[in-house]
Regions:
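Hydrophobic alpha-helical
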Residues: 1-46
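Structured segments of extracytoplasmic/periplasmic soluble domains
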Residues: 21-28, 46, 50, 73-81, ...
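A structural signal for short secondary-structure junctions
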Residues: 28-29, 53, 88
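Short, conserved active-site loop motifs that form the nucleotide-linked donor/cofactor pocket
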Residues: 32, 55-57, 92
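Short, charged, surface-exposed secondary-structure boundary motifs
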Residues: 43-47, 67-70
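Short beta-strand elements at the ligand-binding edges of bilobed clamshell
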Residues: 49-64
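Hinge/cleft segment of the Venus flytrap/periplasmic-binding protein
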Residues: 61-109
Length: 109
């Protein structure tokens, strides 16, 4: 049988659904690594639990930075006619139980 589980999704809610399912199946948290993307309240609540769960972390992104970059691209497009690239990628930072408060502060979330 499967001994180690990886749960990945594009948000914390989906990952937490998988984590809760492993808990119901009595799979130890040490055998589960759940990672989401966003860096929102669901992750913060999980990090504050007394016992570590299978929710390992999230890739935190700053919606403020997304908005600033999008607005700057739009203004440049309007002013100069320079169309933004079709694929604009952003960066994120791994937020885990041990650094979540520092990452929140760093990213302004």
């Amino acid at each position: 049988g499967i001994k180690k589980w990886v749960i990945f999704a594009l948000n914390e809610e989906s990952v937490l659904g998988g984590v809760r399912a492993t808990e119901q199946l009595h799979i130890p948290a040490a055998d589960v690594i759940g990672v989401g993307i966003n860096g929102a309240g669901e992750a913060f609540a999980e990090f504050q639990k007394k016992e570590q769960t299978g929710f390992f972390g999230t890739i935190a992104v700053s919606s403020t930075n997304h908005g600033k970059e999008s607005a700057a691209n739009l203004v440049e497009w309007i002013k100069t006619g320079k169309q933004p690239p079709a694929d604009t990628q952003t960066t994120g930072k791994l937020m885990v139980r041990g650094n979540w408060q520092e990452v929140r502060k760093e990213l302004g979330i």
